[in-house]
Amino acid sequence: MSRPVRNRKVVDYSQFQESDDADEDYGRDSGPPAKKIRSSPREAKNKRRSGKNSQEDSEDSEEKDVKTKKDDSHSAEDSEDEKDDHKSVRQQRQAASKAASKQREMLLEDVGSEEEPEEDDEAPFQEKDSGSDEDFLMEDDDDSDYGSSKKKNKKMVKKSKPERKEKKMPKPRLKATVTPSPVKGKGKVGRPTASKTSKEKTPSPKEEDEEAESPPEKKTSASPPLEKSGDEGSEDEAASGED
């Protein structure tokens, strides 16, 4: 089959009679068409996030402002409470000090009222007892003498104590010298001769001098005197008969 033939129209550009200036004006008037910039999905997400963040930031800032306002109000209230507490403490202290001072004054007044009648009672008692001032002074002197007499008595007692101690000390006793008496042996004894008796009677001059120089000593006989035996008695009788 044969293709159908298309109608072709011949265009005469001369009919338009356009000049080059028209092309220039056309170029000036109509610029290139502006292309729309497609935004990428990342940028869109970032924008959304930034928007959310901005909203959150604004909310946080608002919350912070509210908190700061609350804190300021609390601090103001706390300061006022502290001031009130200080005032109340001061008032309590002042009230306590005033009460203590009042109690002291009351006690002093009570003590003064008690002492006044006692003084009034003591005054007539002193007037009755005490005579003149001279007697009162004499009584004081007596008191001073009494104190001095006490001191003297104490001194005398102290002096008498060592004397008692001296009395208690025992005195040294003299040693008793005992001369044992010669005991003659028993047996037959004859008559003593005259020479023996003369020797016994006449002491030697040396013995006399010694007795004169030496003082007589106290002789305490511890043992009782010995009884003369029969032989000694016979000897004495014989000596007396010879004389």
Swiss-Prot record:
GO molecular function, one term: single-stranded DNA binding
One GO CC annotation: nucleus
Extent of Basic and acidic residues compositional bias: 64-77, 197-206
InterPro entries, per database record: HR_DNA-Binding_Protein
Region named Disordered: 1-243
Record PTM: Phosphorylated in an ATM-dependent manner in response to DNA damage. Phosphorylated by CDK1 and casein kinase.
Annotated GO biological process: cellular response to X-ray; chromatin organization; double-strand break repair via homologous recombination; glucose homeostasis; interstrand cross-link repair; intracellular glucose homeostasis; positive regulation of insulin receptor signaling pathway; positive regulation of transcription by RNA polymerase II
The entry's keywords: Chromosome, DNA damage, DNA repair, Nucleus, Phosphoprotein
Subunit structure and binding partners: Does not interact with RAD51.
Name the record gives this protein: Nuclear ubiquitous casein and cyclin-dependent kinase substrate 1
Organism of derivation: Rattus norvegicus (Rat)
Gene that produces this protein: Nucks1
